[in-house]
């Protein structure tokens, strides 16, 4: 299901991506070390499989997808600085079209507004936090 959802999200992120980009940048924010490492690696693996499949078929309308992975260690401070890096303090060419994550709920409320303000689609594949609902932030989709 995540694979199909990712394909749909990538399609819509492509529709709204600025024309100046030569590729779509997709960020994955997940714990890649520590207590939740296994889950983070599985999330990254699933996204990588979908991206590889899309790229092997020529990308989306000829645009390849760049996958950028960030280990947030389930630390909300790292997630916030990552959001700033991916959404605010970056050129239009390097800005993310889509961000998947974070895995851990503790950072979700702090970063959702950053991505929404930057117009970046965000998929939350695992968070069960009730502090944020899909309608509260433009471009936020919770899978759980």
Per-range role (PLM):
Residues 2-11:
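Sec-dependent signal peptide recognition
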Residues 18-22:
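Sec/Tat signal peptide C-region and signal peptidase I cleavage site
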Residues 27-48, 70-77, 103:
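Extracytoplasmic "Venus flytrap"
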Residues 44, 48-51, 79-84, 96, ...:
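Extracytoplasmic/secreted envelope proteins and their assembly/folding machinery
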Residues 44-67, 91-94:
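Signal peptide-proximal N-terminal region
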Residues 60-75, 136-140:
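Short beta-strand elements in bilobed, periplasmic/extracellular small-molecule ligand-binding domains
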Residues 69, 76-97:
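Short, well-structured alpha-helical segments in soluble
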Residues 88, 93-144:
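Extracytoplasmic ligand/sensor domains, especially the bilobed periplasmic-binding protein
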């Amino acid at each position: 299901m995540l694979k199909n959802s990712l394909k749909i999200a990538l399609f819509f992120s492509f529709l709204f991506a600025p024309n100046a980009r030569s590729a779509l940048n997709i960020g994955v924010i997940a714990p890649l070390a520590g207590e939740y490492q296994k889950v983070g690696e599985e999330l990254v693996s699933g996204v990588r499989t979908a991206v590889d499949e899309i790229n092997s078929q020529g990308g989306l309308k000829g645009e390849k997808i760049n996958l950028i992975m960030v280990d947030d260690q389930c630390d909300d401070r790292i997630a916030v600085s990552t959001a700033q890096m991916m959404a605010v303090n970056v050129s239009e060419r390097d800005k993310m079209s889509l961000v998947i994550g974070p895995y851990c709920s503790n950072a979700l409320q702090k970063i959702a507004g950053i991505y929404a303000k930057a117009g970046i689609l965000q998929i939350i594949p695992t968070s069960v936090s009730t502090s944020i609902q899909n309608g509260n932030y433009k471009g936020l989709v919770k899978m759980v």
